[in-house]
Regions:
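Conserved catalytic core of the tyrosine transesterase superfamily
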Residues: 1-207
Length: 207
């Protein structure tokens, strides 16, 4: 079993980075891995522990460390900024990849490589547009476009999208024979699926 270490606190770190290069990772990606692992090395230095003392509790403390602006940045040794959950998870993913490499190299890891769990992320809930805002958007070509034909075309497209929920690619590919006199539109969707949608009276006025 391999137990030799690099000159720094992280064993086989240089070998790991070299392996990334050998597998055609971009220089930017390799740099990001190196930077993320330098943060982990800083954490070890501040906690005054070494790799052999690694355990699940240390990993949880590292997550708290990443969440704190009191941590030191690599090289400059300055206070860091608050990291978003997505940035913390990217840093933890780098650590998981490094641990996985050590496992593949049969290095005696103090903990399983997959013991590093990602943190929960906050879901960004997109604001639903107000009805008045949607109507204003649909009507905008009528007073923003100088060319009458362009205004009429764009208004018809937006009215159709608003009334039917069709994809824009579906609207742009419509032919006149796809619409019947009742306002029903025949759609050939993805995977050759076929369906019908119906225009509102309002939308039909602009076609």
């Amino acid at each position: 079993m391999k137990t030799n270490s690099s000159s720094n606190n992280l064993p086989l770190l240089d070998d790991f980075l070299l392996n990334l290069k050998a597998n055609h990772y971009s220089p930017e990606t390799v740099y990001n891995y190196e930077r993320d692992l330098a943060i982990f090395e800083n954490f070890f230095a501040e906690m005054k522990i070494d790799f052999s003392q690694l355990n699940k509790k240390v990993i949880e403390e590292y997550k708290a460390y990443l969440s704190s602006s009191d941590r030191k940045t690599p090289k400059k040794n300055e206070k860091g900024i608050d990291l978003a959950s997505s940035s913390i998870n990217r840093t933890l993913s780098s650590l998981r990849s490094y641990f996985h490499y050590l496992s593949e190299m049969e290095y005696d890891l103090p903990i399983p490589w997959d013991a590093v769990k990602l943190v929960r992320t906050e879901k960004n809930h997109s604001r639903v547009a107000e009805f008045k805002e949607l109507v204003k958007l649909v009507e905008s070509p009528s007073y923003l476009e100088n060319e009458p034909k362009t205004a009429a075309r764009n208004r018809a497209i937006l009215e159709t999208l608003f009334a039917t929920g069709m994809r824009i690619s579906e609207v742009l590919s419509l032919n006149s024979d796809d619409l019947d006199e009742t306002g029903r539109i025949f759609i050939r969707g993805k995977g050759k699926k076929e369906r019908f949608v119906y225009l509102t009276e309002r939308a039909r006025k602009f076609l």
